[in-house]
């Protein structure tokens, strides 16, 4: 399988800085791709720091597996790898926050698509979304991980 990846981000018209990070890796064999998007929380200092920390942690954690390190490619093993990657990202953000009072409220959304052959494994936190685009149709693959979404689903 051959992957073609491109990424672009724009700060928008409201923010003074771009707090988004888009990054990816494709292994040498061309059968796996890791796609990562993070959107720092606007309105708080350090969103760009949190999003960069999160993306770097995910890539650091998962790159050995996509590069061909021995790993069990079952859904359970993939889920475990993704959970560890998200935990590492969270740990890095928490550690950085605790070292700088100005960054105490920094945070980020995070979306990861780990594509193996023709199957995508998606993990996310926050309200950044992952879509599947086929035949000019976009289908949302994620559910917003927010208080508002929970209230809507609960009928609150």
Predicted regions and their residues:
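PP2C/PPM-type serine/threonine phosphatase catalytic domain
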Residues: 1-156
